[in-house]
Amino acid sequence: FSAQETPAASAEGSLFDAPAYQTIDTVPHVYHTVTDEKALRELAGRLEASSEFCFDTETTGFDVFGDRLVGLSFAVEPFEAWYVPCDPANLGQVLSILRPVFENERIAKIGQNVKFDLMMLRSAGIDVRGTLYDTMIVHYLLDPESRHGMDHLARICLNYSPVPIEELIGKGARQITMDRVPVAPGTRPRTPT
């Protein structure tokens, strides 16, 4: 380079620059835990009034035939979400209240690895209808050579680093299933510090 020329700044940054991801502690959000029928019916009404919503199933594992549904999570707007714990005692009531929402063809449903969620819900007696968007498939179509897991997509698309699943359930010999995770830590409301 001559004295007047300087190399262009790299858009990728330095090899040693770590991206500053947003986290659950830096992004204002409201997470609701649905613990009674009134709150569940209010959530169902809100989902029914929307043109689309995001959802996820929480299960005791990845075996559609052997594991069970232990929770459902939903989002309609950014930075607000609901978690509905499902234990054997309330599962029938939860599913009967949410079935019309899942089976409403007018409402689009969005998720990550939706095929698994659809199979879990079908095994629980719900036939999800309407337009489906699977963020994992969409990302695969856009970038087939990359990883497509939810944590990776959150980092590259949203500049957000989710709470690692290991922080909730542990790993190895001490790993627990999602039905044994205390609900409050997963739905803690926060404002950034």
Residue ranges and their predicted role:
Residues 1-72, 86-101:
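Long, highly charged low-complexity segments
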Residues 23-31, 67-193:
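Active-site-proximal helix-loop-helix substrate-binding element of RNase H-like nuclease domains
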